[in-house]
Amino acid sequence: DTSVSRGLGDVYKRQNTGYAVLRKKSNEITMVECGLISPKKGKEVSERLYTIFFETNNLIKKFKPEMLYVENVFYGKNVQSAIKLGQAKSSVMLAAEHNNIVSKEFSPREIKQSIVGNGSASKEQVAFMVKKIFKLDDKVLKKNDISDAIAVAWCGINRT
């Protein structure tokens, strides 16, 4: 009998929140779905955060992950950016808690180490490994947010 686990990885940014749902059966990890949550530009902050919460909540209901994995961003280029990232991250984690799903945070270094084998890897190296592992084309990874979310989910599903 083999166990199956599902993990949802989220990467939250100012404009888009990337997500990836991975499935692990025995030692095989497969991609179930990946994409972007894109709140409408020009909306109030509360509306944008609600969209992130609502869409993450829908993903949880659809895929029923056992865990939700997020990147622990502990610095920002400036204070405003750090605050906005923290707000978006909170929306994602609240959706997990709302559904009684445990969320686990990983540092950027841990995520890069897990997918590339080098904690100091560049965004390009992360995207390259994601493409290679899951045999994805450039259209799927049109935004770094998607490859980052896949890397977060990969890290999480391999460590839990």
Model-derived regions: residue spans:
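Acidic, Mg2+-coordinating catalytic module of metal-dependent nucleases/exonucleases
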Residues: I133-T160
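Single conserved hydrophobic/aromatic residue that forms the stacking wall/gate
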Residues: D1-L8, Y12
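Short, solvent-exposed loop/turn segments at secondary-structure junctions
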Residues: G76-V79, K112-S114
